[in-house]
Amino acid sequence: MIIKLIKAEFEDINTILQMQKVAFAELYEKYQDTETSPATEKYEDILFRFNQPETTYYFITADNEKVGVIRVVDFKDGVTRKRISPISIMPEYRNKGYAQHAIIEAEHIHGKHNWKLDTILQEAGNCYLCEKLGYHQTSKTEIINDKLTIVFYEKD
């Protein structure tokens, strides 16, 4: 199976939004995070980020099938950490290694060093993936509600 990142275009914003809503719906139901969940974002939120010069959205494809979306924030200044936020895999494509391959490909495109990302502390599989890819937890966490804590990772 060939995994690729395909740069999204302006006309893809609705597709990005719909894929993100579907991909994060289960986590939204589980944690009821109305403030920061990608499942609750609107078109204008994606449009705002899409227009940021440091942001690139990519479709994650497996044999030319769209299986998810990843957003990379890269100021390309050699100082500011690059950021993945968010990465989403459609439910029917999970647990097949697509997120891992997408992160590796993003690092290949944007450079392997000086990254950060965050994930849900309570989602052990997400934390395992970050650590498997060489990211280490920082001391920073953010409690969103009584069910959900965000943990932050970096990779040098």
Describe the residue ranges of each PLM region.
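Conserved GNAT-fold acetyl-CoA-binding loop/helix
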Residues: K21-L47
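A short beta-loop-alpha structural element at the N-terminal edge
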Residues: I3-Q18
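Conserved GNAT acetyl-CoA-binding A-motif
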Residues: H108-L121
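Conserved acetyl-CoA-binding loop of GNAT-fold acetyltransferases
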Residues: E131-T141
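Conserved beta-strand in the GNAT
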Residues: F59, E65-D74, R81-R83, S88
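Conserved acetyl-CoA-binding loop-helix of GNAT-fold acetyltransferases
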Residues: P86-I89, N95-H108, Y128, K132
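A conserved beta-turn-beta hairpin within the catalytic core of GNAT-like acetyltransferases
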Residues: D74-S85, R94, H113, I144-T149
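A short helix-loop-beta-strand connector motif used in the catalytic cores of GNAT acetyltransferases and
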Residues: L47-Y58, G68
